[in-house]
Amino acid sequence: MKIDMRNISKSFGTNKVLEKIDLELQSGQIHALMGENGAGKSTLMNILTGLFPASTGTIYIDGEERTFSNPQEAEEFGISFIHQEMNTWPEMTVLENLFLGREIKTTFGLLNQKLMRQKALETFKRLGVTIPLDIPIGNLSVGQQQMIEIAKSLLNQLSILVMDEPTAALTDRETENLFRVIRGLKQEGVGVVYISHRMEEIFKITDFVTVMRDGVIVDTKETSLTNSDELVKKMVGRKLEDYYPEKHSEIGPVAFEVSNLCGDNFEDVSFYVRKGEILGFSGLMGAGRTEVMRTIFGIDKKKSGKVKIDDQEITITTPSQAIKQGIGFLTENRKDEGLILDFNIKDNMTLPSTKDFSKHGFFDEKTSTTFVQQLINRLYIKSGRPDLEVGNLSGGNQQKVVLAKWIGIAPKVLILDEPTRGVDVGAKREIYQLMNELADRGVPIVMVSSDLPEILGVSDRIMVMHEGRISGELSRKEADQEKVMQLATGGK
């Protein structure tokens, strides 16, 4: 299959996101699509797969003009799109999610459970994973859910597979399994569009790379004929001399302390964070880092343990109590827990601080709009309009909206779970700079990250977890990748 996208433009109201795009895709090739968040990568692929139409332009498939009315039509034609955010039903089982809308039936019209199970297990085997078929998908980790999304697409007869940040929530082993599958698909003649910000993956797996910036294509070339410095410069329009901005904040006394905390999947977790300090939490997927943070914030139930702010013990059983105590929490899954996608930017940003903008029972629209506009400008959110629906923003700009929401409460402590997941290199640096600015003001920050270079580049101290327990603590000076991984795998 050969796809030619010609003169594709797209606007949402007055917001132009694509302008005169020409792109060729070919079966049997792995084609990287790179660019900062907001460059238009996902929008272009959404047009290809029928989620919404182009404002102008034409799509040719094997020389014939063709458009799809919805993603289902595209899938039936052999073009599938695995989105960055999960497209699953948490209450339904793994098997039900896999075959939703594509159920296999017997000659009597009944569900052919045996054949569906067989196909599901065969697909999981190709991916190199073992996941129970009869448990609710909501009980699985983000990484496992991502693997199911990938498996779902593999159940189709594929010609072109579009993958948007497919490894963002995967372990190293799962990533290697994915690469094996992608290489196998290529050998079978399937074309893969690989949207990613991870340079090492681009050079490891792709044949061609296209760079987008501000809704236009900057360049397309064979991956082997370019390098990471050139790609970064083309993505952001400048060279990133220093990936992690230098931190100048003075670290003060202990401001946030957790003692002997126990909950689901973790026990006896103790740590502290000082004013102006960024404390990194590292560990393999399933180590319990996210569960600890969710318990502190009152999402998950605490079994035992104490939490203190400024040496005062606090009681938290719900997120609303955590917010009242001054705790902000950016969750790892922004779509389901961090944002209301149908709401606009202003409504999302002011959700935790509504009372601050209310006087005598009335919401102060003028003050809140001014406040939100200041945050939009400060975080370089690409829209410029507080009334723009959050669902129309790129993943990176959505992440900035979640950050702005918690900055708005003037937090006493800020917990960030995978703050730069799915975010491009330019936006990552902006987020790191914002973290440094907050630390300069004395805000203690806890950062959970699966990105080891990020942990090493941003953290003042590093806590490492293994199988639900703290396995070690490292200072910034003594930490390196080998020491962190040794602790993360249970070594000493």
Swiss-Prot record:
CDD domains: ABC_Carb_Monos_I, ABC_Carb_Monos_II
Organism superkingdom: Bacteria
Major place of residence: membrane
Residue ranges of domain ABC transporter in the record: 3-239, 238-492
Catalytic reaction list: D-ribose(out) + ATP + H2O = D-ribose(in) + ADP + phosphate + H(+)
Gene Ontology cellular component terms for the protein in this record: plasma membrane
Positions with a binding annotation for ATP: G35, E36, N37, G38, A39, G40, K41, S42
EC number(s) from the headed UniProt entry: 7.5.2.7
Molecular function GO labels: ABC-type D-ribose transporter activity; ATP binding; ATP hydrolysis activity
Membrane topology value: Peripheral membrane protein
Protein role: Part of the ABC transporter complex RbsABC involved in ribose import. Responsible for energy coupling to the transport system.
Protein name: Ribose import ATP-binding protein RbsA
Originating gene: rbsA
